[in-house]
Amino acid sequence: MEKREAFIQAVSKELVEEFLQFLQLDKDSSNPFSLSELLDELSRKQKEELWQRLKDLLTETLLESPVDRWQTVEVEGADDMESEHSPKMRKSIKIICAIVTVILASVSIINEHENYGALLECAVILNGILYALPESEQKLQNSIQDLCVKWWERGLPAKEDMGKTAFIMLLRRSLETKSGADVCRLWRIHQALYCFDYDWEESREIKDMLLECFINVNYIKKEEGRRFLSFLFSWNVDFIKMIHETIKNQLAGLQKSLMVHIAEIYFRAWKKASGKMLETIEYDCIQDFMFHGIHLLRRSPVHSKVREVLSYFHQQKVRQGVEEMLYRLYKPILWRGLKARNSEVRSNAALLFVEAFPIRDPNFTATEMDNEIQKQFEELYNLIEDPYPRVRSTGILGVCKISSKYWEMMPPNILVDFLKKVTGELAFDISSADVRCSVFKCLPIILDNKLSHPLLEQLLPTLRYSLHDNSEKVRVAFVDLLLKIKAVRAAKFWKICPMEDILVRLEMDSRPVSRRLVSLIFNSFLPVNQPEEVWCERCVTLIQMNRAAARRFYQYAHEHTASTNIAKLIHVIRHCLNACIQRTLREGSEAHKECEKENASVLDKTLSVNDTASMAGLLEIIVILWKNIHRSLENNKEAKIYTINKFAAVLPEYLKVFKDERCKIPLFMLMSFLPASAVPVFSCGVISVLRNQESVTGRSYCTLLDCLCSWGQVGHVLELIVDWLPTVPPQAKSNLASKRKVEINDTCSVKPELALLYMEYLLTHPKNRECLLSVPQKKLNQLLKALEGSKAELESFLQSPSGNPLNFNKATALHAFGLYCRMSVHLQYKFCSEEKIHLSILDDTGSWLENKVLPLLEDQEEEYLKLRKDVYQQIIQTYLAVCKDVVMVGLGDPKFQMQLLQRSFGIMKTVKGFFYVSLLLGILKEIAGNTIIHKTDSDEKVTVLFDLVQEVFQKMLECIACIFRKQPEESLPLFHSVQTPLHEFITTIQSWHKDTAVHHAVLSTLIAAPVVEISHQLQKVSDIEELTSPQCLHDLPPFSRCLVGVIMKSSDVVRSFVDELKACVTSGDVEGIVCLTAVLHIILVINKGKHISAKVKEVATAVYRKLKTFMEITLEEDSLERFLYESSMRTLGEFLNP
């Protein structure tokens, strides 16, 4: 009793410290004092006295320290921490916090019979000061907000004002902090929204914040947030329209995964709405989504999101009222969309129709319902007969989904008609691979309904030849269908598509198809649940059916079973081979023959050592399987040692028995899997076999080189290669010195062709190249020096009148030069000690080309060049190809690239033809797309580099144009070979350097070339009456036709080209009637292409204005320019005003 009285008395100005002490004790969990318990124990009179004292203390505190001064004190306190007002303010805040704490606890115990007027006054005062509190007093703000929320929830007097305050504060805080707890608290007082009049000016801020909630992910993802958002639809009819516009405007930026939540918000709002609000949600929101779902372009980022929203409503058809609503809202737009002239509108409408089927009103009579469904079946049939492939594909999806879902309810004749149309006609639609693909992607939907299996079992065999479709995606879809048939046991897949056809496709098809085919037939040829002997029998059967298909099958087999099973199969095949060998050795013994007849297996009857194809096939399968589980064996040392020992024991015998070349290659590959010590006899003789080869008739040398590389003996091969390459003997220093020396002639034969083949193989395969480059640098330098001799040989050939090399023949010298260039790059990359790779050897080769080769070709007669054409062309191609690869992998710095571009000027100046153009365009493309250079080098260096890129491109087009002028017909097919690299270069410039100097320069060059050619053609016309405007690309001159054709491949390039064309016309870079007419011809052709730019008319307008300045020519006598002027103005008039 004394404590209650003491607490009440402490609520005063004089004993305020005791009051604060009580509140501190309440916070201390170790102290028995509890504020809530104390308040529960107070009598009615004590409560009223306490509340009156709280009001008095609050009033006195605020009078002594008004809230409006707190902001000023806070600002001053930042500059002067010793301000005398600051401690006073902090004390006042502490007292008010304590008062709010007691009031919050009191709200829970208020009884309606008690006089809580003083408490109400306190709440109103605190509500009034809330907005004036400084930002730093977050704790006090939160406490007053909690009071407002609690006051609203209790429904006490003045709850409207308290609720409005709490609503605004929580709404603002939830948007600022993005806290889920604030969203939940806001939902608790959501009814407070009705306290705000929608039309009041004060509600404008509320509207903005509420609309912001609809694009706030925190609200959309949280259940309470979605409830709150759907509730907002009930505030005002006009606000519904604002909500819908906000969501529509933000759809592009929202994740697709959020669309189901957005749809749920609309659906909840629709379920709870009535009257005018329901009508607004249906016709202004849901039907608006339907309209845009039909009319939006498929490539629009919003289209798929709109469809997600509509899909949610389609899925809710079982809910009361949804089906009727969908029928009513779709009726005025969907059927019209299905018959629209625009094919994309029809396609979009078809998607919605298929997803929403059946669209009906549950209130229909039975007759009305039957008529409506029949009408929709007819619409579905129209879809699969539509002339537009995408609509037909959607129709196929509809047929399959509807048939699967409503199989029992659909009339049998309609089902048969639909499926015959799909499997008998659309599966063989020659006009569209997408339609054929849709058939096989959608038929598995029907297979999910078991009732469809008997009918499909009759129809599907007609599709067997689809496995050989010329479109990969169709073949993939067809095999997926076979896998589905196998999974659901609808039919035997080999009755639909014979095993022979499957193996043929497995042999030749791409990885996506082959992997699926292996999955399809895996259990047939590797039945892991049967004895291991059966595995081997099936393996032999597969090899004998199709050896190449067997290789592909076992290449992917490890993806469908454990590595232990693959290892078992390897040893089962080894046992099989051993048994065949042993049976051959025992063939002379009659006793053994009788015994074998009794215990003969299937393999004993079908397999023999003399069956070379089967033996080679089994050995190949072992190699493939071993490669597949190589990593697993590395992790299982015991299994690896066991396998190595077993094969080390039998491989020498295999080499004796299997002498055919087809068997030798897999045997050598198996040897490479073993350490050299495991097969000492063979490993010691490999280098001798390679040395004794005279000519290369097969590929056995490749596997022998693999063996040496895997054994770490590549150094022996390197020595052999160097020995076989011819060397230029050093010049004698003096006659005296030569007399004192004894000459020893090395009789080792020189085999440069074979040496280069070995070298090519080592350098081409990554693992072997790694072994080669691990050899000491000194030996590699010797090899490089030997290869460098090819330069002297090639130079000699170009110089000598007879055209015969000294040591190499022509082909060998060129081969050696190519290997020299490639090897020099690998060596410098391997042994460079600095951060950057200095390609000095390749740079020296470029200098040699520039200073030695090209001068030999300058000013030479045609006959001289023709004799050496293949040599100098291949030298240049080899050098440019290696340089292109260097730039592509990022080894060439800007200095190297600039030197390369400078040398290209010399090449273009000296030689003629197209042979270097593709490579040079590739180099320009790689330089333009090398973003690393752009980031790491100075702007000045990059500017110089790209100036060179543009200059080289311009010079190259000039050279090509010159060739076209001299030999137009011969040049046309040659130019087609460079169209792809030209397109790649232009698109790279467009992608990486749009609106930069190099971009504008390249476009200007592309404009100048056709303008000059077309102008030249116009000026050469003898009969001006024959002049007509071009109707298509083929009406342009040859070079212009090729260039404009390349430009028209990309819509982005077309837009930039047209912009640059307009700039050239406007600035006067293109002037004169003839040149302006050439521009007109270009834009007429572009306007006929598939990427039509709206800016073409802007160019036409610019040309029209320029031509009007030449109006006085109509006063002159008839001339070419007057005719061109009049015809161009006439054409422009028709073009601009159709």
From Swiss-Prot:
Species of origin: Mus musculus
HEAT repeats by residue range: 459-497
Reported tissue expression: Expressed in spleen, lung and testis as well as in hematopoietic cell lines.
Compartment annotation: Nucleus
Complex formation: Component of the condensin-2 complex, which contains the SMC2 and SMC4 heterodimer, and 3 non SMC subunits that probably regulate the complex: NCAPH2, NCAPD3 and NCAPG2.
Major location category of this protein: nucleus
InterPro entries noted in UniProt: ARM-like, ARM-type_fold, Condensin2_G2
Any GO BP annotation: inner cell mass cell proliferation
Positions carrying Phosphoserine: S30
Keyword entries, A-Z: Cell cycle, Cell division, DNA condensation, Mitosis, Nucleus, Phosphoprotein
Protein name (database record): Condensin-2 complex subunit G2
Physiological role: Regulatory subunit of the condensin-2 complex, a complex which establishes mitotic chromosome architecture and is involved in physical rigidity of the chromatid axis. Is required for early embryonic development and is essential for viability and expansion of the inner cell mass (ICM) of the implanting blastocyst.
Gene3D superfamilies for the chain: Leucine-rich Repeat Variant (1.25.10.10)
